[in-house]
Amino acid sequence: IAGYGLSVSAPAQAYVQAHLADPAFRRWRAMGLVRGADLPWYGRDDAQVAWPGPAPLLASAIATGPSENTMCPYSGDPVTDFLSLDGRTFGFCNAFCRDKTQADPLVWPAFAALR
């Protein structure tokens, strides 16, 4: 429904929007964007629409630090990969931790606590 912009009733659309706004769903989506595969059995010939959920903050992966934090907010390990957000630099223990955060920064409580 959401990914293809399919028309549904107002109550059904409200149900979809509630799911798209749910932080747990958004974390799952972020990880899928980073490491997930497109599963062909879910594909349709219809044109897809842009992400219809809440707009995530724009962040970008950068090659070097230093970062404001020395330990990854998720694992507690030393940082090796970096992200820029709002002119600030944050570090992560690996590219996956950085990239899932880049996809939707504020849905990750451990990262949001750094801001």
Question: Where are the language model's segments positioned?
Answer:
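C-terminal alpha-helical interaction module
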Residues: 1-68, 83, 99
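A conserved hydrophobic position in a structured secondary element of the catalytic/binding core
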Residues: 20, 92-93, 103
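Short cysteine-rich clusters marking metal-coordination/redox-active sites
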Residues: 72-74, 83-85
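Cys/His/Pro-rich metal-binding microdomains
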Residues: 73, 91, 95
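Cys/His-rich microdomains that often coordinate metals
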Residues: 78-79, 101
